[in-house]
Amino acid sequence: MQMISKLISVKLGIVASALLLGSCGSSTGNGEVAEASQSQAAAQSDGFVQIFNGKDLEGWDGDRAYWRVEDGVLVGEVTPENPLKNNTFLIWQGGELGDFELKGEFKITEAGNSGVQYRSDLFTEVPYALRGYQADIDGRNSYTGQNYEERKRTTLAYRGQSTTIQPREGELRENVERNAWKGLEVTKSLGDIDSLKSLINAEDWNSFHLVIKGNKLQHYINGVLMSEVTDEDTVNRKMEGLLGIQVHVGPPMKVEYRDLQLKK
């Protein structure tokens, strides 16, 4: 009987140890699941949803010679071996957007030129090209934060400006001067252009937040309002359209995006 009791005790000890080890492993796994669930719940609670899965280009369409996913990050790159002839865009396939907010983070090399395109049309003369509003981003931070309208009215607000855009008669090109729309009226200052530039990290991660409501278009970088447009040009403005990310023609460059969250 004593031998049987010892055997039972040993077996119970082994089972208890196994359960303890299983519990430890399970708690680590559950912790990771819980953390992911909490993050997802937080995103859902404030209405934002992820539109980039961090794994592949599912839900996006573009020239894969220039776009890829690497280490959970969306990468657009131009190399000496693979130059770019025209601006190209990675276009979100979730449909057209009207009023929305978009948050994310970007990092760009010094020679880089990129931007987040929104309320845009396909420019069918060039593959993967868009025409419309753009939250401008560049590696030297000369333009980062401004509102530039690709293939249309050009600059609608420089960094540090709150503007009202008025309609103009005649052809588009006749109403553009020094790469800015002649109907651009500065209504107030949001800050000195160079002081605002100092808030943007060179060749490092920055956050952006676009708040697009009706005819008011706001671009935030690192939580600071960089430009604001009230578009009164009922002839040329767009109230809905496509969303995309740009790689600009020019020297070799690399731009990275992550944590893209959309709220409609």
Question: What name fits each language-model region?
Answer:
Residues 2-14:
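Bacterial N-terminal signal peptides that target proteins for export
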Residues 24-264:
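Carbohydrate-interacting regions of secretory-pathway proteins
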Residues 11-23:
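Bacterial N-terminal signal peptides
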